Amino acid sequence: MSTPESTPVQEIQAAADALVAAFAEGRLDDYFGSFAPDATFVFHSTPQRLASAAEYRALWQRWVAEDDFRILGCTSTGQLIQHLGSTGVFSHDVETRIATRAGEETVHERETIVFARAEDGSWPAVHEHLSARTTA
C-alpha cells in the first residue's frame, strides 16, 4: 500500500517481503492472499501453467493431502526489484526447506514474481515463475 513518503520500489519490496514471509512461515491465507485471483504460475515441478491463485491453492492442498507437504522455512537472497510503471519485477534466489512423508529436503531455486499496482495502491502478485537453480 502506498504512503506519501514511500516510493514504488519500497512498496514493491514490502509486498515481496510480505509474500516471502507468509510462505516461509506457512501462513497460507496470507500467502495466497498476496496474489491477484487471476495470477498465473509457472513451476519447473509441474507440467502445466497454473491459470489462477485458486488453481495453485488446490494443487498445494493436493500436495498436503498426498505427501503431507509443508514448508519448514525459506531464505531469499540476491533480490532485485525493477519498477516498470504500474508493474514491478522481483527476482531472487530462494532456498526452501520442505518436509514430506519421504523426509526433509532443501531445494535451491530462482524465482521471478511480477507485481501490478491495483487501484487501491496495493501491489498484488500477478505472475510467479520458479526455476531450478543450477550449480554451474
Where are these regions (language model features)?
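Short beta-strand edge/turn micro-motifs at domain boundaries
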Residues: 108-136
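A solvent-exposed, acidic/Ser-Thr-rich amphipathic alpha-helical stretch
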Residues: 8-11, 15, 28-86, 93, ...
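A short, polar/proline- and glycine-enriched secondary-structure boundary/capping micro-motif
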Residues: 100-103, 135-136
